[in-house]
A protein has these predicted regions:
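Phosphate/pyrophosphate-binding loops at sites that engage ATP/ADP/AMP, CoA/4′-phosphopantetheine
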Residues: 44-61, 109-114
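Claisen-condensing/thiolase-fold acyl-transfer catalytic domains that form or cleave C-C bonds
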Residues: 39, 61-141
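Condensing-enzyme catalytic core mediating Claisen C-C bond formation in acyl metabolism
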Residues: 1-40, 44, 126, 138-141
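A short, structure-level motif marking secondary-structure boundaries and short turns
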Residues: 30-32, 57-59, 90-91
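A short alpha-helix capping/helix-coil boundary motif
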Residues: 24-26, 51-54, 83-85
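Non-catalytic alpha-helical scaffold/packing segments enriched in small hydrophobic residues
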Residues: 13, 37, 41-49, 59, ...
């Protein structure tokens, strides 16, 4: 649903060979399509990992989603009728840190003392190729 290309000063440095390109090649993404995908995938993924582990949302201390967009997480919280306090967000401080967003969030939770040994966390991500995945983690210091 979206294509990625590059066009900016220095873009020739990123060209790794192959046919010569001419013209502009800006990075583009169909944000609305990605949003629709994410707000559908995140709750499905969470339900899948909870079902597989025979847990419920109430069994989790934290849900750490890919930190792509605060509105995506807020939409999922509403769709799940969940407690927003369980859904960790740090985009206001770091923005979208791409593939590192879940590890960065987990580290931040641990370093600030909000993540305690024995707590159960769902990590739910989505990304390139419109893929998604999740896991349940029990934190051990």
């Amino acid at each position: 649903p979206f294509a990625l290309t590059l066009g900016a000063r220095g873009s020739d440095v990123l060209h790794a060979g192959g046919p010569d390109r001419t013209g502009s090649a800006p990075i583009t993404m169909d944000g609305k399509a990605v949003f629709r995908f994410a707000v559908d995938a995140l709750p499905k993924c969470l339900h899948t990992v909870l079902d597989e582990t025979q847990l419920t949302l109430d069994d989790l201390e934290w849900v750490v989603c890919h930190q792509a967009n605060s509105r995506i997480i807020d939409h999922c919280v509403r769709a799940l009728k969940a407690d927003p306090a369980k859904f960790y967000k740090n985009m206001d401080r770091h923005g979208n840190t791409s593939a590192a967003s879940i590890p960065v969030a987990l580290n931040e939770l641990a370093e600030t003392g909000q993540l305690q040994p024995g707590q159960t966390i769902a990590c739910i991500g989505f990304g390139g190729g419109l893929t998604w995945g999740g896991m349940i983690v029990e934190y051990k210091k």
